């Protein structure tokens, strides 16, 4: 670790069902924005990020957003893809075995597979952090998540939850540079959130992606 970098910890690519952002385009945009790393956290898949990581191993970090039977887990430095629909405990065990950094996606955002306070308290022993700032959340949700983290001795992650290129970098952390899950665990201790909540209109990117992918499937056309 050393110099301070700005990193968006929650990013979706075309690998997610509700995004059209290609990996190469995300890489170029991240570089343009001056982000220190590119972390891709697609829904229940690591296909795109593993492919991009082979091309840019010193810049791209593999993540995954895993839908469990309770809520979504945001995992960083994953080595093996986890399927959706498993229990949180199964996910935590498998992620711990990989040495991954474990955060919980958008607490209090109950309409988006967020987590309740009771659930977060139940799973505290397995967590490295929770997401305390998500650009697609309402401000009150982010403030509540940050308050919960502070009261329970947890560190926080922050991200744009980008589903379109224009969202990338809307939120994130400024923190010491890191190259492993263990270094990240140390870096988040002195991290600061940057950015602000996105307008509700960004949901357009997700809905457009879902619609276009549905049409392409019906026509038998592959997008990637």
Placement of each model-derived feature along the sequence:
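Charged catalytic cores and adjacent phosphate/nucleic-acid-binding surfaces used
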Residues: 1-17, 22-24, 28, 47-62, ...
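Divalent metal-dependent hydrolysis catalytic cores, especially in the metallo-beta-lactamase
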Residues: 27-44, 100-103
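Glycine-rich, histidine-containing beta strand-loop boundary motifs that form or position
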Residues: 42, 106, 160
